[in-house]
Amino acid sequence: MITDSQDQMKRGNKMGIVSSASGASCWRGLDYYKNKKIKNLKKINDYEFTSTAIGTNNYDIYLDVSHPRRSTCTCPLATGKRIVCKHIVATFFTAFPEEAKDFEKEQERL
């Protein structure tokens, strides 16, 4: 059974993806999510996922929700860097759709 503190910790870890990304990456990631550009989402465990972003080019994504900067993407922006790009954010929103809704609600309040 998940306790309230475990649930808060889990939510805090999940929100780390959004807080680690730039505003532009969050909005573009939300757009990718809404347009269903993330394919082949595979759950490794509760905090790790892999996927493919479909666009002009296809990119492979590894998402580590517990450690956002360990997430990787083969796009030019993120390759070899510890950057949370739009593809990583889109994978996060695809894995956790409620977080996409929460992100939009939070932005409406600002």
Q: Across the structure, where does each feature detected by a protein language model lie?
A:
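Long, low-complexity, compositionally biased intrinsically disordered regions
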Residues: 1-110
